[in-house]
Amino acid sequence: MSFSTRSLLIATAVAFAAVVLSPSAQAQDIIYTLTKKAGNRGNIPPDGMTAAEVSIDMAGVVRKFPANEIIKIAYAEDPSELVSARNLTVDKNYNSAKDQLAKIDPAKVERDLVKQDVIFYKAFVEAKLALTEGGNKSDAASALNKFYTKYPKSYHFYEAAETLGDLSVAIGRFDLAAGYYGDTGLGGAPWPEYKLKAGLAMGRALVLAGKFDDASKAFETVAGSGENNSEANALKQHAIVGKAQCLAETGKPDEGIAILNDIVAKNDPQLDGKLFARAYNALGNCYLKQSKPKDALMSFLKTDLLFFTDSDAHAEALSKLAKLWDETGHADRGTEARNKLRERYSGSAWATKP
């Protein structure tokens, strides 16, 4: 090999390495989706995001990803603390995520999309902690609402709307919840499943507000949907459970029990434990309306012991069990249920109910 040829090859290799290893070549955004958790790499332009989808330039080819399929987005300029916090949030380790986020000053973050993520995760984590372990719900709602109103084109928009609705319910502001769950919030999402989820959430909020006729209508709308996929069908089953509870609350507990027993008989607890938690809670409430405290206790106990993955349903079960154990002569068990409720779900509205 001649000296000139060798020199040319070396120069070419160095130039190639410089391109490959340069920050501009290495710095890429990554969209992680439900179908490709390894990530889709490219560059998201400043105007590449809406509440419904995110566009990314992948080697000259622009692809669009629906927001409801996105697990998370990692940006090229992410601070390491944000990378950790984002992963911790996905894993629902909110306390550790909060610790990481506390190290980041949003004012020092230059890229707007990264700054949006910092602001969102700071507010979202505080909201989740306020709803579960405790904290100032009003402050958490205020912080998240600032993000919600300032960044309506963020792909986090609908998640923020749902969480704000949950916070509103937790502080008894059902009027505010209606807005967050409604057409300007979660219910305005372009995906049918999100609309069903919004209707279900609104129905549950109306139950807590004592507006059982309105709640029943909300549940009927969801249950009567023509959507037919696994997620939609699951949401419709949950709506039927809500409808059954409304029957009990409006003087028809026998009808409610028949519907709920049918739900339990026809579904698999291994596939949807949360449905069974809601169903057994609703059965418990039906039995309470029939003045059958022992039957009610056994229903709520099933949620506590077998179907506790739905934190809201579990909190309700513990709240009802605390009273029922006392009423059935087991004050020690009542104290145990009350303590468990306060330790695990001090942020839940059920923890403050008398």
Per-segment meaning from a language model:
Residues A25-Y151, Y155-D166, A170, G188-A189, ...:
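Compositionally biased alpha-helical segments
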Residues Y75, L113-D117, Y155, E193-K195, ...:
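Residue signature of alpha-solenoid helical repeat architecture, marking inter-repeat boundaries
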Residues M298-L305, S319-A349:
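TPR/TPR-like (Sel1-like) alpha-helical repeat modules
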